[in-house]
Structures are given as structure tokens and as C-alpha cells.
Amino acid sequence: AGDEVITSAYTYTASASPAVHVGATLKFIDVAPDSFEMDYEALEAAITEKTKVIVPVDIAGVPCDYDRIFDIVERKKALFHPSNDVQRAIGRVIVAADSAHAFGASYMRDGERIMCGNVADFTSFSFHAVKNLTTAEGGALTWRPIEGFDDEYIYKQFMLLSLHGQTKDALHKNGLGNWEYDIVAPSYKCNMTDIQAAIGLVQLDRYEGLLKRRRDIIERYDEAFKTLGHLTVPHFTDRHTSSGHLYLLRIPGIGVDRRNELIVQ
């Protein structure tokens, strides 16, 4: 329908490919100078009457500047033309965060600490094998309440998309007398298994300690690099607390060829 989705150019394909799956047009925004986040001025300039979703990327586990992003979509509200009931209820460009790196991160808003997952309109997390918390594969999705929509309705839409368009999830289907179900759409198959969930629950029990250990390591790195003039990600500030997923370092005068040589060495 000509809809547009905007995301960061500095990310993994998962931030962008869902837009392609639904036939939308992608717009990539490069990072700002001396930053790992989107150039927010370029983001604002890229919004048109066709823009439906912005996908900020919480790179390395550091939350984006969501206050600035929401200010932008509010200023551009007059351009927004909703094409479904959820878009009409939200009434502006939707902010759907790629927080694959940021499970356990938090963001300060009006003096209140808000956990990542309750900042953007929708937030996706990854539990891939290399993430802080893993279920071997898979992830999770959260959303803020949408006026006029019951959470159970939103959940069911995701259930239909992730389980072949089946009208009952595995838990309800296995209840006494509940075996019968319908297929209402040719959807995907990406639901989490019980075994994966069990692994995740064990990880959750120890996750607070894992986050603390990552913070300890990052603070040691920060201390070591602070006088060298390298660009690093600000993991812990008055605005946010990172999950510490990656420690990114940009060294002046060192390009990708030298980086690759060091990795091989």
C-alpha cells in the first residue's frame, strides 16, 4: 500500500526484514557523527505521509533517546494517515523498538525508571544463543496498553501470526475437550517450545547477577579507555541503564581492514 518503515542502518537484518515481508518500503537512517544511534534530525526529515512505523535499535543494550523519538512523532502527527484500527488508536507513527540487545535495560522518563519493554509502543527482544539471556533461539515481544484494545486481543493477533494462523495456542488446545481449532490465515511458525521456555526461566533466575557482572566489566573497560580518545557507547548515564550486551569501540585512524587483521591475530 506504499507504507514506509524507518530504521537504523547500523543494525542486523531482523530490524528491517519484517517490513519487506508485509510489502512496505524501507528507509534507512545512518548513525549521527560520533554516535552509534540514528541521526535524529535525519529521522525527522525522513518522515512522510506514508510513514507508519519507526524501528529504533537499542544497539549494544543501550536504549535510544526515546523522549526525542516520541517528540519527533508528535511533531509529525499531522502527516500520519492510519490504515488500520491499531494505527487509528495510537494516532501517530508507531514506535516499535528493536531491543534484541537490551533485555533488562531501563530508561529514565520524568524521573521514573522504566524497564525496556515498556518504553516504546512495541518492543522485541532476542533470546538467541549469543544474547545475555538465551533460550537457545527465539525471543519475546511486549507492548504498552493501546486504548480501546484488550491485551488478550493483541496477544491473539501475535499468536495467529506465530502459530500457522491457529485459533488456539498449545496450552489451550491441550485442555480437556479443547482439541478442536481452526486455521484462519496462512501464517508463520515461530512459537517458543516448552524446552526453550524452561531454559529461559532458569536464565531469568540468575539474570540480575549476569547484568551486574556485565556492568562490572564495562566499568573496568571504561576506566581503561577513558583517556585514549576512543568513541565508546555510554552504557550507564542519568538517562539510561544498559543491559551491557556489547562493548563497542571506535578507534580514530583504525579502519575495518585493520580491525579484521586484529580479529584473525
Roles of regions detected by a PLM:
Residues H101-F103, N118-T167, D194:
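Active-site PLP attachment segment
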Residues V53-V57, V62, Y66-F70, I146-Q265:
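PLP-dependent aminotransferase class I/II
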Residues D65-H81, V95, G104-R109, E137, ...:
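Short regulatory "switch" loops immediately downstream of catalytic or recognition motifs
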Residues E49, G91, G117-N118, C190, ...:
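Structured loop/turn residues at beta-strand edges in well-structured enzyme cores
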Residues S83-L133, W179-I183, T232:
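Conserved active-site segment immediately N-terminal to the catalytic lysine
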Residues T48, H128, K226:
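Short conserved AdoMet
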